[in-house]
């Protein structure tokens, strides 16, 4: 029986290799699928699905130690890019206009639920060996308007990204949290996600 199972597994792998079907890794504790082909080296925006007026933004002037929070602003402090590290893990780098770009990480390398996400390191070489600066994106499918939906997970802590407290126009901090409190994020190339009204404008 074990021999038959090994043969079947080998045949499946050969079929995938020959047909070019990408191998995606399922997360045991996630309803999403680990995305190993996130877009890199492009300006991206990370928006809260439950209220798309809110997107990731970096406090103040985006200097070392500035917190990442939710904001309705559409200015320069909400631009990010992804740098591929390995095996589905990415660095999330804040793009600072006329300043220093810095990677998001978990403050104090904490594994605790509720720990803040802030920006710190600017050197690309100092991300690969630092798991608190590495994040995975679990694809949940597109929304009705074609925006890609994700859960985001930190490598070191194994916790998910959400926000502290309530929205209520108070620009809450991005934090790592328990699975039950994780949020769905839209990752887009436009500051405002697709709304479905674009086709009406074209008409």
Where are the model-predicted features located?
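Bacterial N-terminal signal peptides that target proteins for export
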Residues: 1-11
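Gram-negative bacterial Sec-dependent N-terminal signal peptides
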Residues: 10-18
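Residues in well-ordered beta-strands of folded domains
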Residues: 17, 69, 93, 118-120, ...
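C-terminal segment of classical bacterial N-terminal signal peptides
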Residues: 17-26
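Extracellular glycan-recognition/adhesion modules and their associated mucin-like linkers
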Residues: 28-63, 79-111, 128-167, 186-203
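Short, tandemly repeated low-complexity microdomains enriched for cysteine and small residues
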Residues: 61-76, 109-125, 131, 164-181
């Amino acid at each position: 029986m074990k021999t038959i199972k090994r043969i079947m597994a080998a045949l499946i792998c050969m079929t995938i290799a020959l047909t070019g079907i990408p191998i995606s890794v399922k997360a045991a504790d996630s309803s999403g699928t680990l995305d190993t082909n996130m877009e890199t080296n492009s300006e991206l925006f990370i928006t809260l699905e439950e209220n798309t007026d809110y997107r990731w933004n970096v406090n103040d002037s985006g200097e070392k130690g500035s917190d990442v929070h939710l904001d309705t602003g559409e200015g320069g402090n909400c631009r990010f890019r992804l740098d591929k590290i390995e095996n589905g893990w990415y660095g999330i780098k804040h793009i600072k206009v006329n300043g220093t770009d810095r990677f998001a990480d978990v403050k104090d390398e904490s594994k605790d639920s509720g720990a803040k996400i802030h920006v710190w390191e600017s050197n690309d070489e100092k991300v690969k060996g630092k798991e608190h600066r590495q994040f995975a994106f679990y694809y949940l499918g597109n929304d009705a308007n074609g925006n890609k939906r994700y859960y985001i997970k930190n490598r070191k802590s194994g916790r998910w990204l959400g926000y502290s407290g309530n929205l209520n126009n108070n620009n809450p901090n991005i934090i790592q949290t328990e699975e039950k409190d994780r949020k769905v994020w839209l990752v887009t190339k436009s500051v405002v996600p697709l709304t479905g009204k674009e086709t009406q404008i074209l008409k």
